[in-house]
């Protein structure tokens, strides 16, 4: 038995598997990576409170990928499972410019999948000192990217180092009176051919902080509190077509000794 564990440990420690295409996302932010033509990826994200977000992404050509996802809360556990929405969310990625030695890749995209549960909450709006009305807020705990553009550049520095920066605008989760343009950036550092370190920051400028000053009932919805979201992760290429990722999210917001943890499993294949 000890020999079996030793063999497994050595295999895991020294396995060197290259993934056939660059990362499509970091922990959550999009990159300029797309799927090769004739390739699909099935992704499963396991989130807090037994949540699960399965996603299917297909490469129509080397620069154009489309996909859809569907969020479920309480999928694991004893509570009744509930879907975030009745219809699936969509993803579209189109890389306009390829990366060169001197210039980054440039991609435009659309992603309607937010993070966490989908919140539908009636909150009071103070019209004047004597009257108020109810407004229904409809948004994810962390808003979807919506329309976005992203630049990605890679360097070979004792393994690949990729840097990604982008802007996004969510035009459909705006009932919190905040449709500001948002900024995000991050990096991925290859530790060896099997393991990569991920680090990212979502400024969450569109998180509804201006509206929060007007509405007392919006406190638990504006989860960013104006600080944005800092996330980190470790990605393991178990095989050429299989990735597992352990992520630590919102580490700048959590006052506890432990972070919000997620597991992401990605399987890719040709068709």
Regions found by a protein language model. Give the residues of each.
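Transmembrane beta-barrel domains of Gram-negative outer membranes and organellar outer membranes
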Residues: 16-163, 167-172, 188-271
């Amino acid at each position: 038995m000890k020999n079996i564990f030793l063999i497994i440990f050595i295999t895991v420690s020294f396995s060197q598997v290259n993934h056939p295409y660059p990362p499509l996302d970091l922990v959550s932010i999009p990159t300029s990576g797309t799927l090769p033509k004739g390739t699909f990826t099935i992704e499963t994200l396991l989130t807090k409170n037994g949540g699960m977000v399965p996603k299917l992404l297909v490469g129509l050509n080397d620069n154009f990928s489309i996909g859809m996802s569907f969020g479920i809360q309480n999928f694991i556990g004893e509570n009744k499972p509930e879907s975030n929405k009745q219809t699936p969310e969509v993803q579209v990625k189109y890389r306009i410019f390829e990366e060169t030695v001197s210039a980054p890749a440039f991609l435009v995209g659309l992603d309607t999948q937010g993070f966490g549960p989908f919140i539908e909450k009636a909150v009071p709006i103070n019209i004047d000192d004597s009257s108020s009305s109810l407004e229904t807020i409809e948004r994810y705990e962390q808003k979807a990217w919506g329309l976005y553009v992203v630049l990605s550049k890679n360097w070979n520095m004792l393994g690949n180092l990729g840097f990604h920066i982008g802007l996004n605008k969510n035009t459909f989760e705006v009932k919190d009176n905040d449709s500001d343009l948002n900024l995000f950036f991050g990096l991925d550092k290859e530790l060896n051919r099997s393991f990569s370190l991920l680090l990212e920051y979502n400024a969450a400028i569109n998180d509804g902080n201006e509206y929060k000053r007007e509405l007392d009932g919006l406190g638990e919805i504006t989860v960013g509190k104006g600080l944005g979201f800092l996330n980190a992760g470790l990605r393991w290429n178990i095989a050429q077509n299989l990735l597992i990722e352990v992520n630590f999210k919102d580490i700048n917001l959590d006052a506890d000794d432990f972070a919000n943890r997620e597991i992401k499993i990605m399987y890719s294949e040709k068709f």
